[in-house]
Amino acid sequence: PLCLNTVQGYWVNLLRVRKSGVLSRHRHPAPVHGVVLRGSWHYLEHDWKATEGSYVFEPPGETHTLVVPENVPEMITMFHITGAMIYVDPYGRQTGYEDVFTKIEMCRAHYTKTGLGGDYVDQFIC
């Protein structure tokens, strides 16, 4: 993460993908903003492609499925996500979610496992 804001309920992170394929089908209750820093990707539900330098806006409530094409060795996108990521199945039924608080707990577990210590995440919380 770059920022985990518990007061306003958002997080900013760099999504790095080094393998092609479908990442997830999800939606958000609030707007999401992104900037593609490397590589490219697209949503199954749209005909546009997000390429290096592209600004991406995801409107609230829209379900989309992020896909990284086979010819892309690495994709990095900076996302600013407010509210939550709500994971859904092909029928739109919720299968899980992430918000700033679950992100913090995921980071604590990861940093503990890697030897940095769970409190390493505290520097990103604002």
Model region roles, listed by residue range:
Residues 6, 41-65:
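Short acidic-glycine-tyrosine-enriched beta hairpin
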Residues 14-16, 40, 80:
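Residue-level recognition of well-ordered beta-strand positions that form the cores
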Residues 18-20, 28-45, 51:
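Glycine- and acidic-residue-biased ligand/ion/polar-headgroup-sensing regions
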Residues 51, 60-90:
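Ligand-binding loop in jelly-roll beta-barrel domains
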Residues 86-126:
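Acidic/histidine-enriched, glycine/proline-rich intrinsically disordered or flexible terminal extensions
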